[in-house]
C-alpha cells in the first residue's frame, strides 16, 4: 500500500522545530533558520547542536560523532562520518545505551575529547542516556544532535549504508530501489541484479533537470512514494554519494549510498 500522508514520526520533529524557530522571533531576538534550530529543551545536562553545526563538525572533523543506536540500525543507514560502538553489556533493549568503555577506546581515553551523539530524533532517549553515562565517567565535552536521523533526512541529509546493511535490505525490504550510478556501458557490462541505472554523468545542477528528471518520468525513481528506501552505489563511494545528494535535493528523504568498492557491495548483495 502506498503512503497517503506524511509519516507522523516526521511530522512531530518538524513541529518541534517550528516551535524552536518561532520562539526567538516572538521574543524579539534574531530569527533562526531551520538549519540552525534545536529543541531548546530546558535543564539538559549536555548542550544540543543544530544541523548546520553538525555539518560543519563533520566537514572539519572537529569532533568524533557517535551514532548511539544499535549496530544493525547504524549499518542500514547512518550519518556519513559517524562511528558506532557496541552496546553496554547487560542492558535490556528498551533501555539501550552504548558502551562507554568502547567509546573510550575510540577517543583514546581522552576525557576532554569533543564528542557528538545522535540517535532516532527528538523522542529517542539513547543519546541522552549515553550522554549522562559519559558525564559520569568524566567526559567534559559532550554534545547532542538531538534532532537525530529523522530531521537530518528531512533537511536533505543523505545517509551511508554498510555492507551488513546491504545484505539486510536485500533480504528484508523488497520495496527498496537500488540505483547504479555508473555509466550505461559499465552498468550493462557488469550489472547488479535488480538495479536501475542513473548515471552520474547525466546528473545536472538544479532541480528536475537531466537524468534525474528522466528517471522521475520513466519510473526508475519511486514518484508515488517518496518514503521508499533508495540505495545508491557506483564505481566508488564518491560517485555514489554525488548521485545520492542529487536525489535528496529532489525530496527523496530516505536515500543512502554505499561508500565501499563495488565488488564488496556485489558480494553483500548476492549472499
Name each region found by the language model.
Residues 69-71:
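Secreted/periplasmic proteins that engage bacterial cell-wall peptidoglycan
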Residues 54-57:
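Post-signal-peptide N-terminal segment of Sec-exported extracytoplasmic proteins
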Residues 2, 12, 16-51, 75-117, ...:
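Rhodanese-like catalytic fold shared by cysteine-dependent sulfurtransferases
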Residues 65-67, 178-180:
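Structural scaffold elements adjacent to functional motifs in cytosolic proteins
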Amino acid at each position: 500500500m502506498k503512503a497517503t500522508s506524511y509519516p507522523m514520526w516526521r511530522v512531530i520533529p518538524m513541529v518541534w522545530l517550528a516551535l524552536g524557530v518561532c520562539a526567538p522571533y516572538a521574543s524579539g531576538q534574531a530569527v533562526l533558520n531551520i538549519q540552525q534550530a534545536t529543541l531548546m529543551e530546558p535543564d539538559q545536562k549536555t548542550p544540543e547542536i543544530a544541523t548546520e553545526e553538525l555539518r560543519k563538525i563533520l566537514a572539519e572533523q572537529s569532533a568524533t560523532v557517535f551514532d548511539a543506536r544499535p549496530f544493525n540500525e547504524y549499518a542500514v543507514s547512518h550519518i556519513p562520518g559517524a562511528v558506532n560502538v557496541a552496546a553496554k553489556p547487560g542492558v535490556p533493549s528498551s533501555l539501550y545505551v552504548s558502551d562507554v568503555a568502547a567509546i573510550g577506546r575510540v577517543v583514546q581515553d581522552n576525557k576532554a575529547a569533543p564528542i557528538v551523539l545522535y540517535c532516532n530524533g527528538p523522542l529517542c532517549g539513547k543519546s541522552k542516556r549515553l550522554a549522562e553515562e559519559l558525564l559520569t565517567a568524566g567526559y567534559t565535552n559532550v554534545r547532542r544532535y538531538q534532532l537525530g536521523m529523522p530531521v537530518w533526512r528531512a533537511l536533505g541529509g543523505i545517509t551511508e549504508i554498510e555492507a551488513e546493511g546491504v545484505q539486510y535490505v536485500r533480504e528484508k525490504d523488497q520495496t527498496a530501489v537500488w540505483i547504479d550510478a555508473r555509466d550505461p556501458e559499465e552498468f550493462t557490462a557488469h550489472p547488479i541484479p535488480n538495479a536501475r541505472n542513473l548515471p552520474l554523468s547525466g546528473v545536472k545542477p538544479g532541480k528536475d533537470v537531466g537524468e534525474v528528471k528522466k528517471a522521475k518520468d520513466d519510473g526508475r525513481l519511486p514518484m508515488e512514494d517518496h518514503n521508499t528506501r533508495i540505495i545508491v552505489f557506483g564505481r566508488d563511494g564518491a560517485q555514489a554519494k554525488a548521485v545520492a545528494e542529487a536525489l535528496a535535493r529532489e525530496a527523496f528523504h530516505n536515500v543512502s549510498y554505499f561508500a565501499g568498492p563495488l565488488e564488496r557491495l556485489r558480494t553483500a548483495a548476492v549472499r
